[in-house]
């Protein structure tokens, strides 16, 4: 056999359901890589003969290998700070009250409009490095802090540029319908003005995004303080006509039926979903839409309404765990902490949490045929951890357990 590298003396949490073991585990295992893909994996005793002198061999010393982690929901490119709003919330102001008073997303919009691409790139690079140090190999980055054509394009350009200069793969999402900008707010004609902004998103922003090939998907914030069902459907229809995947912020603060609409239109995921009901869960199950859990926002906003975890299990909806890294509701740049929070706050099992940041996260980004679990033919994105069981990744936080990271067959962290 001719391989580019071989890993021995490892235990592998493949996260491959076909293995039939918790975590898709193969103990006392080995794995071979060729041309950036996994060429062989299985018990060490069954490893075929290969040219030891011509092949780099890495010894895992009995440690665990997992797929590279995938953060499927971030707002990583932004400028400014909202620490003052943190203080206001601790004094009793709600997220909705701050947003309606012109804070929240709108304050970050102002900072992003004023920042240039170089500043945004450097801020994004620092945050991406922080995630990469925790074993993240793929990240989704949304726009949504521009709310005008120029700034939305600027944010997406920076996200694309980060992907060109970093080993972490970047999937970009156009979130022009994140909030209604101040220039379109009119209390006397709120629906009419927000409809006019949706016109801008659909007729001008999206074509400009497509002209520069800046987005892989389109997202909308469907809530009482943002966009209604009819407006969401308009954006989704335009996105699908443009050939883009769709996903939705839904049921975070209330339930207006966004998840059912997203499911009907074939969305990859619905995200937040604290107020999701059984009808919505059933719709997700029938459409194969993923449920993205964002424990960082739940924690930071001190929410009390839990996502319907038992219903999601009952209907076998793929559960994803993501950081939602953003300046207002989840300024926590740690994917590993999200694994712990998903277990402690939402009562996921450690296996469910890890699946939520690997195999299910890949599904939520539409890349499950290439990454997210370890099997022959899959891209060789994986991490070696100094742990005695895969459950330790969700159990304990704060100690650096990452030993190695391999990205597309190349050792990028050692």
Swiss-Prot record:
Binding site for N-formimidoyl-L-glutamate: 145, 326, 328
Keywords assigned by UniProt, alphabetized: Cytoplasm, Histidine metabolism, Hydrolase, Iron, Metal-binding, Zinc
Annotated Fe(3+) binding sites: 73, 75, 249, 324
Pfam families given in the database record: Amidohydro_1
Molecular function GO labels: imidazolonepropionase activity; iron ion binding; zinc ion binding
Cofactor binding note: Binds 1 zinc or iron ion per subunit.
UniProt record, GO biological process: L-histidine catabolic process to glutamate and formamide; L-histidine catabolic process to glutamate and formate
Positions bound to 4-imidazolone-5-propanoate: 82, 145, 178, 252, 329
Keyword S-adenosyl-L-methionine: no
Domain of life of the source: Bacteria
Subcellular location per the Swiss-Prot or TrEMBL entry: Cytoplasm
GO cellular component, one term: cytoplasm
Binding positions for Zn(2+) per the UniProt entry: 73, 75, 249, 324
Reactions catalysed, as given in the entry: 4-imidazolone-5-propanoate + H2O = N-formimidoyl-L-glutamate
Cofactors, names only: Zn(2+); Fe(3+)
Keyword Repeat found: no
Broad EC category: hydrolase
Family affiliation: Belongs to the metallo-dependent hydrolases superfamily. HutI family.
Function of the molecule: Catalyzes the hydrolytic cleavage of the carbon-nitrogen bond in imidazolone-5-propanoate to yield N-formimidoyl-L-glutamate. It is the third step in the universal histidine degradation pathway.
Protein name: Imidazolonepropionase
Organism: Shewanella denitrificans (strain OS217 / ATCC BAA-1090 / DSM 15013)
Name of the coding gene: hutI
